[in-house]
Amino acid sequence: MKVVICGAGQVGFGIAERLASEQNDVSIVDASPRRIQIATDQLDVRGVVGHGSHPDVLARAGIEQADMLIAVTLHDEVNMVACQVGHSLFNVPTKVARIRAQTYLQPEWRSMLSRDHMPIDVVISPEIEVGEMVLRRLSLPGAVDTVSFGDGSVVIAGVLCGEACPVVDTPLTQLTQLFPDLPATIVAINRNGKVMATRSSDQIQTGDIAYFVAPADQVGRTLSIFGHDEIPAKRIIIGGGGNIGLYVAQELEKRNAAARIKVVESNRERAQAIAEGLSRSVVLHGDSLAREILDEAGVADSDTMIALTNDDRVNILSCLLAKQLGAQRILALVNEQGYAGFAHGLGIDAYVNPRQITVSKVLQHVRRGRIRGVHSLLDGAGEMIEAEALETSPLVGRPLRDIDLLKGMRIGAVVRNGVVMRPSGDTVVRAQDRVVLFALADDIKRVEQLFRVSLEFF
């Protein structure tokens, strides 16, 4: 696949890194020569210095042959115009635009971004995607990772198995016997930084992060089996009042009437601005790394501290300070995968990685076949995938035990007409079923083959 990416910042670089690693033909455009130099030095991509919405610059990037244009600069208007140019002058099949300003995304104005008005096929808002991930973590405090598929009917959750975890050293087949009525399936394990698909003979070890698939209404019960029955937070401190912090605070005010929210923002003008946009939250002007500010926010009595500034180090350190001062749980926004790798070891209860979240959103549209959802694990080592089974799919009409699935794949659930089914060897997938599965990176091409439209269909 030929892909042109406009914007070589954190988001654009992350997308380019992932797509290039999968042997796609990637060109990346940015006005900064330094960013292009970094991208071409570190990645197998073609770099072009220039304005991402200029036709001549896009032409130099090879837009005429592109299958997809991904515009993720920091400027919404540049992204919009780039998509318009890609459509009108170069007939690019798929256009993806990053939109940051919330006014464009309001329901009354969003139709402007539809194909009928502005030729944007996919709108991504990393700030909203990250904000929603934070909100999901708050609703499931026992999980270190979570995503929902099947129109919200299915949840995938990662859970840390500590020394007190009741199911450590128990074979997965025995778990099924112990809890026969629990419709949850463990599909993957992260062990010492390496992710693997599970088999029935596997045992969970202390320190593992187990990923399970369960109906949304059974996630709490499943977490309790792993020894996690934490109560969702009510007293919440948010460090950082940027777009993500403001979105999380606003949504908490709407969704959680019992929540008591404090927002700490270091910029005085920004603090005043977000205070005007919030109704029940208390906004404090100050540094979230300052002990006196955290004390003023009531950190000793808080349930959760969330650090959402643009600086990974500030987020990690402010969370650790908050925990030392009495916060029950801490959640940090971490952009650099290197920091994310040791976050749990430092005592960070959970973290969100904006780059990984955005890449997952883009991959949903890069993957071939009827792929409805993608959630990347461990910086691309594996993926949770939701796909629609077609009449011509090799999965349809045969018991799962007769399907030649690779060792790096594991089916976690089948959704039929809104009903979530736990898969067994006797399960027969039907056309239009939604299948939720895990696949290692090397086996994703096989997943695409299973869910692609066969030429025989036509």
Swiss-Prot record:
<dbReference type="Pfam" id="PF02080">
    <property type="entry name" value="TrkA_C"/>
</dbReference>
<keyword id="KW-0630">Potassium</keyword>
<keyword id="KW-0633">Potassium transport</keyword>
<dbReference type="GO" id="GO:0015079">
    <property type="term" value="F:potassium ion transmembrane transporter activity"/>
</dbReference>
<feature type="domain" description="RCK C-terminal 1">
    <location>
        <begin position="144"/>
        <end position="228"/>
    </location>
</feature>
<keyword id="KW-0997">Cell inner membrane</keyword>
<dbReference type="Pfam" id="PF02254">
    <property type="entry name" value="TrkA_N"/>
</dbReference>
<keyword id="KW-0472">Membrane</keyword>
<feature type="domain" description="RCK N-terminal 2">
    <location>
        <begin position="233"/>
        <end position="352"/>
    </location>
</feature>
<dbReference type="InterPro" id="IPR006036">
    <property type="entry name" value="K_uptake_TrkA"/>
</dbReference>
<feature type="binding site">
    <location>
        <position position="98"/>
    </location>
    <ligand>
        <name>NAD(+) 1</name>
    </ligand>
</feature>
<dbReference type="InterPro" id="IPR006037">
    <property type="entry name" value="RCK_C"/>
</dbReference>
<protein>
    <recommendedName>
        <fullName>Trk system potassium uptake protein TrkA</fullName>
    </recommendedName>
</protein>
<dbReference type="InterPro" id="IPR036721">
    <property type="entry name" value="RCK_C_sf"/>
</dbReference>
<feature type="binding site" description="in other chain">
    <location>
        <begin position="73"/>
        <end position="74"/>
    </location>
    <ligand>
        <name>NAD(+) 1</name>
    </ligand>
</feature>
<dbReference type="InterPro" id="IPR003148">
    <property type="entry name" value="RCK_N"/>
</dbReference>
<keyword id="KW-0520">NAD</keyword>
<dbReference type="InterPro" id="IPR036291">
    <property type="entry name" value="NAD(P)-bd_dom_sf"/>
</dbReference>
<comment type="function">
    <text>Part of a potassium transport system.</text>
</comment>
<dbReference type="GO" id="GO:0005886">
    <property type="term" value="C:plasma membrane"/>
</dbReference>
<feature type="domain" description="RCK C-terminal 2">
    <location>
        <begin position="372"/>
        <end position="453"/>
    </location>
</feature>
<keyword id="KW-0406">Ion transport</keyword>
<keyword id="KW-0677">Repeat</keyword>
<feature type="binding site">
    <location>
        <begin position="235"/>
        <end position="266"/>
    </location>
    <ligand>
        <name>NAD(+) 2</name>
    </ligand>
</feature>
<dbReference type="InterPro" id="IPR050721">
    <property type="entry name" value="Trk_Ktr_HKT_K-transport"/>
</dbReference>
<feature type="binding site" description="in other chain">
    <location>
        <position position="30"/>
    </location>
    <ligand>
        <name>NAD(+) 1</name>
    </ligand>
</feature>
<keyword id="KW-0813">Transport</keyword>
<feature type="binding site" description="in other chain">
    <location>
        <begin position="7"/>
        <end position="11"/>
    </location>
    <ligand>
        <name>NAD(+) 1</name>
    </ligand>
</feature>
<feature type="domain" description="RCK N-terminal 1">
    <location>
        <begin position="1"/>
        <end position="124"/>
    </location>
</feature>
<keyword id="KW-1003">Cell membrane</keyword>
